[in-house]
Amino acid sequence: MRYLTAGESHGPSLTAIIEGIPAGLTLHPADIDHELQRRQGGYGRGARMSIETDRVQISSGVRHGKTTGAPITLTVINKDHQKWLDVMAVGDIEETLKLKRRVKHPRPGHADLVGGIKYHFNDLRDALERSSARETTMRVAVGAVAKRILAELGIDMLHHILIFGGITITIPSKLSFRELQERALHSELSIVNPKQEEEIKTYIDKIKKEGDTIGGIIETIVQGVPAGLGSYVQWDKKLDAKLAQAVLSINAFKGVEFGVGFDMGFQKGSQVMDEITWTPTQGYGRQTNHLGGFEGGMTTGQPIVVKGVMKPIPTLYKPLMSVDIDSHEPYKATVERSDPTALPAAGVIMENVVATVLAKEILETFSSTTMSELQKAFSDYRAYVKQF
């Protein structure tokens, strides 16, 4: 399985092409639209999300509600493009129109300046448009297809926010996977403690009035993955490493950890390692899951627990100082439409990129020309792991 995305933030559309999806997977536009709508939700989103109502168009690889095994083409139209016809025109336009929305005061923390240096851009909009988080629309769309595969194999997932702009979420003890999932899904903030909703919303409103932004830490949990996915034989076959790369590829993500993560640096080996158990009904298990479901780059059969840290969004309505790329004089940075926070949306994106990596690993590991073939191979493997 592989995919490519294309498109700019204010261009006519966004596109993804996915190759390697088995034939026979039940797939409807509504499956993808559901994830796209989740990405657009959450408290703190800005004006752009009131303009766009993301809906996918599937133009290849699916017929009568089933995948055919051919490449799948997904497209999402940018409604906002109608206001940017001159600025984002494909053909050449008058010089005065080219200057209309030219970006020459790069934003600290964004790809504007370095992208312009790398690709020799006189107008930093050429970097801004592609590096925008709008691109993640298609990664969520691809992830929605991946999640359909995982669901057919008995794998489920959730995300929730652990730290919201410096506020630590108090997680009630002994919540099951399903309880965590339900609480997060029914929260505008993707948190599992409803008692903290108003405190955080008030804080977001305050940050917005100040023209500032906030980040946080998101946790994704995956349940139902058997032991043995990934490999230790080469560095690039380690599944946790693949997941780390995928999470860090999300716009504004600056760190990743598994299980208790960096806290391991403060603990002893006897406190961190997950003791092994075995029962006739369940096979192998663990007393704990401090390592987040991975040993040696391979899944252990415990829930996968991965955390990502998102920096505050770089675009500030009270901009920081920058430099004019023509005169090299100090100037306030460019202001584009932005949000005080996008943590709930980032959680949906993270969940979907994790799903994509896991689906890809499964498709590469098991016979998967068709879904029925994959389901049998996966079921047989589960049985093997249980009796090992």
Curated annotation (Swiss-Prot):
EC number in record: 4.2.3.5
UniProt KW keywords: Amino-acid biosynthesis, Aromatic amino acid biosynthesis, FAD, Flavoprotein, FMN, Lyase, NADP
GO biological process, one term: chorismate biosynthetic process
Pathway assigned in UniProt: Metabolic intermediate biosynthesis; chorismate biosynthesis; chorismate from D-erythrose 4-phosphate and phosphoenolpyruvate: step 7/7
A Pfam family the protein falls into: Chorismate_synt
EC category: lyase
Residues reported to bind FMN: 130-132, 251-252, 296, 311-315, 337
Listed GO MF terms: chorismate synthase activity; FMN binding
Cofactor annotation: FMNH2
Top-level taxon: Bacteria
Cofactor binding remark: Reduced FMN (FMNH(2)).
Assembly with partners or alone: Homotetramer.
Protein role: This reaction introduces a second double bond into the aromatic ring system.
NCBIfam families: aroC, PRK05382.1
Family of the protein in this entry: Belongs to the chorismate synthase family.
The name this protein goes by in its record: Chorismate synthase
Species name: Streptococcus pyogenes serotype M49 (strain NZ131)
Gene: aroC
